[in-house]
């Protein structure tokens, strides 16, 4: 029986993780759950799964949930998240809290010697140097939950890193892959939230529409698989059946394929190094006989190009880019700026940032706060 803690249990990844836990109830026990503020769902989850620890980041919401669950101890704030992340009974911690909020709990879990299923790509983007150093020191398994990185992880199993020529991340291309510049001027929030193949939370869905999500995944792959930026390519694959590929020095390639559903990589992380019967029918090749590939347009989707620039520059620029992007996405969702302005504003902000080396968690948090402040007060410029 594997004991798991889920940070972000009320989000898309968290809910899917609990679905797998239901499916594999003879193998998986949920011992801790944590969320930002959705206490209605957290209450229902706690009653179903009976975890030892319940944590809510929002202090007022934690107090309210405690009143609803008098027989339970509800922990609050960042301290509560850290307690859930380092809980002694947990074998595996699923890090699925969106944004930089998940960075400290992820580090805490690794420090406690826990294996980590990482769905929070921002943690590696902002703190990759610190996290990977800790992973090596603690000798834990860092298991990627993103479908692309899970695919690469599986393709590299048993392979020598020196034989890797290229890592190829696939992208659906998002909902605006074929849109003209004129059409992109009028993108609505509803249109950007309508992803063609994946069901995700709002922030990740908007990032997928700008290809920033793919840019963050490029940086994540750099840290996870110890390759150079030049060895990481992105290709648009609208069907999202091939989740990523590895090309080796002898010219052969390995790809991981499945229906586009996050249940598959989540279950792999929960059962690793074993596999277990899944929730899906055998793959239908006739139904999925058309697989297409295109080159991404980095001029139209400038966020992808910006992510490559941040990775090559290094230092605090990836952290700054990630935090500023989070705020710009929030502003778009609130109707404060246009879809095209996300990339334009981000480029302007990144050009103004003086990158320094990442030497501590304090540096990361300070740069994160600076980026958020500057992105929140940045003045909009014309997209034309």
From Swiss-Prot:
One GO term (biological process): isopentenyl diphosphate biosynthetic process, methylerythritol 4-phosphate pathway involved in terpenoid biosynthetic process
Binding site for 1-deoxy-D-xylulose 5-phosphate: 121, 147-148, 172, 195, 208, 213-214, 217
Superkingdom assignment: Bacteria
Catalytic reactions on record: 2-C-methyl-D-erythritol 4-phosphate + NADP(+) = 1-deoxy-D-xylulose 5-phosphate + NADPH + H(+)
The keyword Kinase is assigned to this record: no
UniProt-listed InterPro entries: DXP_reductoisomerase (IPR003821), DXP_reductoisomerase_C (IPR013644), DXP_reductoisomerase_N (IPR013512), DXPR_C (IPR026877), DXPR_C_sf (IPR036169), NAD(P)-bd_dom_sf (IPR036291)
Keywords on record: Isoprene biosynthesis, Manganese, Metal-binding, NADP, Oxidoreductase
Keyword Mitochondrion (UniProt): no
Pfam families registered for this protein in UniProt: DXP_redisom_C, DXP_reductoisom, DXPR_C
Binding-site positions, NADPH: 10-13, 38, 120, 122, 201
EC number: 1.1.1.267
SUPFAM superfamilies: 1-deoxy-D-xylulose-5-phosphate reductoisomerase, C-terminal domain (SSF69055), Glyceraldehyde-3-phosphate dehydrogenase-like, C-terminal domain (SSF55347), NAD(P)-binding Rossmann-fold domains (SSF51735)
Pathway, per record: Isoprenoid biosynthesis; isopentenyl diphosphate biosynthesis via DXP pathway; isopentenyl diphosphate from 1-deoxy-D-xylulose 5-phosphate: step 1/6
Residue sites binding Mn(2+) per the record: 146, 148, 217
Disulphide-bonded residues: none
Obligatory cofactor(s): Mg(2+); Mn(2+)
GO molecular function annotation: 1-deoxy-D-xylulose-5-phosphate reductoisomerase activity; manganese ion binding; NADPH binding
Role summary: Catalyzes the NADPH-dependent rearrangement and reduction of 1-deoxy-D-xylulose-5-phosphate (DXP) to 2-C-methyl-D-erythritol 4-phosphate (MEP).
Family that this chain belongs to: Belongs to the DXR family.
Protein's recorded name: 1-deoxy-D-xylulose 5-phosphate reductoisomerase
Encoding gene per record: dxr
